[in-house]
Amino acid sequence: MRPWPEKLRQVLRHLAAARYYLPVELKPGQFPESEAQYQQFLHHTEFALALEELEGLGDENTGHAEEELFWSELALAAECMGLAEHSTRYWEKIKGLPK
């Protein structure tokens, strides 16, 4: 097994946590294969692509109790990957959530 740098492990933890905060039963949405695609990207360490799949799942599955936690974890993952535009977009989504 290859050693994983701490930064990659941290990104993986944030992405996994983000998925955890989505509903267990996802709405089928426009792209029903998104969750399987997300998992495939994780296993191939294509974390930026996994992040984008999760973003799509988050956009399709709104209004759940843990939505703020989902976007927070996604923002933290984006920050770890140096994706400032993504991170800013996710923090803005949190600001727009109903309180």
Report each predicted region and the residues it spans.
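C-terminal-biased regions
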Residues: 1-99
